[in-house]
């Protein structure tokens, strides 16, 4: 069974990753609000969401599905292992529900081994271990038919500039990503149509080695052996907004470079830590979100919209951990529909003879369906 595509421009599929709705909602000031969700139960919740017509796809970190043991780096290949069995149980649920897998990403941030980085760790033994973990993730992604491999910058960053080996650090990162490409080719994995870099300016490190979409594209073209295979999946509005950048500019640049492979989606208060608010939730970002979709339509881009956010900690219900998680999925999808409907209204925007301020006000009025007569009447009262 393959679920029918969403196909409301510019969105082809809506993807709800395991890490979003499974989040137990701990933060630096308090422990988890919700109980940990077993990965098989999470797959069943995704199946329920798909049955409601909310999603068509999902993604995962390797650690979202099965634990990782650095002493058993190929447990996914052992039919007698719990890892092998669990992965196939999850796949059976997703396949039955017709849920596609958009991407597999390797968690190089959760285990304390990688506290000083994964692919850029100054210790060659830890870099080698990170590569082996990434290879395991690629095998798991192959099992699920994932279309992309995501490299999120994770802990590949720094706090102290003078503690970094600047002559070699980007070479180490290139070795890791080139190695991922080589492994895909060596194993003959046909499911992967590409791999992506997900940049972030900071957090969990003080600074990241690839902080923005522009840095990611420059690195791809300047350091990787097969730049055509690699693109970017920006997390918008969050990651670029943390650095006071505008999401419309980000997608415009990436589309112009043919490097916007798919989109991670949520909301953000600019210049804050990574809020990871659900789409359209919070005090700002409505215009930016709507104009981002308007720009993507204007440029003719179409692709997967993947949620990368979590429910508000205050909205979590420990008495109904499954119900509040399902409601979070519904809220994300509802927000997407609202944003796309509002972007539809901008299709009639006429800018002839208007300056920039007039154009912005005209777009806002059009988005809110305010007619000129009503506006003029309120101006006079």
What are these regions (language model features)?
Residues 3, 9-17, 46-68, 77-111, ...:
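Glycine-rich, aromatic-flanked loop segments that form ligand/cofactor-binding clefts
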Residues 1-54, 139, 162, 175-185, ...:
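Histidine-acidic metal/acid-base catalytic patches
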Residues 24-31, 65-84, 110-128, 155-168, ...:
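Surface-exposed, active-site-proximal loop segments in enzymatic domains
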Residues 90-93, 122-149, 168-188:
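An active-site-proximal structural segment forming one wall of the substrate-binding cleft
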Residues 57-59, 103, 150, 264, ...:
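Conserved beta-strand positions in the central sheet of alpha/beta enzyme cores
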Residues 20-22, 62-66, 105-110, 153-157, ...:
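Active-site-proximal loop/turn and secondary-structure-junction residues that shape catalytic pockets
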Residues 106-117, 146-168, 190-207, 211:
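Active-site-proximal loop/short-helix segments
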């Amino acid at each position: 069974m393959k679920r029918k595509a969403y196909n409301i421009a510019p969105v082809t599929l809506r993807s709800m990753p395991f890490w979003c709705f499974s989040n137990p909602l701990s933060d630096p000031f308090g422990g988890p609000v919700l109980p940990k969700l077993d990965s098989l139960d999470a797959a069943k919740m995704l199946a329920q969401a798909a049955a409601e017509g909310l999603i068509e796809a999902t993604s995962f970190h390797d650690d979202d599905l099965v634990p990782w043991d650095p002493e058993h780096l190929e447990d996914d290949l052992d039919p007698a292992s719990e890892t092998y069995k669990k992965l196939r149980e999850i796949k059976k649920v997703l396949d039955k529900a017709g849920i596609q897998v958009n991407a597999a990403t390797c968690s190089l941030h959760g285990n304390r081994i990688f506290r000083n980085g994964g692919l850029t760790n100054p210790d060659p033994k830890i870099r080698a271990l990170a590569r082996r973990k990434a290879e395991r993730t690629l095998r798991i992604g192959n099992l699920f038919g994932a279309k992309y491999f995501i490299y999120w910058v994770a802990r590949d960053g720094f706090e102290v500039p003078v503690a970094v080996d600047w002559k070699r650090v980007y070479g180490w990162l290139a070795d890791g990503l080139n190695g991922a490409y080589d492994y895909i080719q060596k194993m003959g994995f046909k499911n992967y149509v590409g791999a992506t870099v997900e940049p972030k300016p900071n957090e969990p490190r003080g600074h990241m080695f690839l902080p923005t979409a522009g840095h990611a594209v420059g690195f791809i073209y300047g350091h990787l052996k097969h730049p055509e295979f690699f693109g970017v999946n920006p997390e918008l509005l969050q990651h670029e907004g943390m650095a006071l950048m505008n999401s419309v500019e980000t997608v415009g640049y990436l589309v112009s470079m043919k490097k916007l492979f798919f989109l991670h989606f949520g909301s953000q208060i600019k210049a804050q830590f990574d809020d990871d608010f659900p789409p359209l939730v919070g005090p700002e970002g409505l215009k930016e979100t709507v104009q981002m979709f308007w720009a993507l339509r204007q440029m003719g881009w179409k692709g997967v919209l993947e949620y990368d956010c979590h429910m508000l900690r205050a909205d979590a219900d420990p008495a109904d951990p499954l119900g509040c998680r399902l409601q979070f999925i519904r809220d994300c999808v509802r927000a997407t529909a609202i944003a796309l409907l509002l972007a539809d209204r901008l299709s009639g925007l006429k800018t002839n003879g208007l300056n920039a301020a007039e154009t912005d006000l005209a777009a806002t009025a059009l988005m809110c369906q305010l007619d000129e007569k009503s506006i003029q009447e309120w101006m006079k009262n």
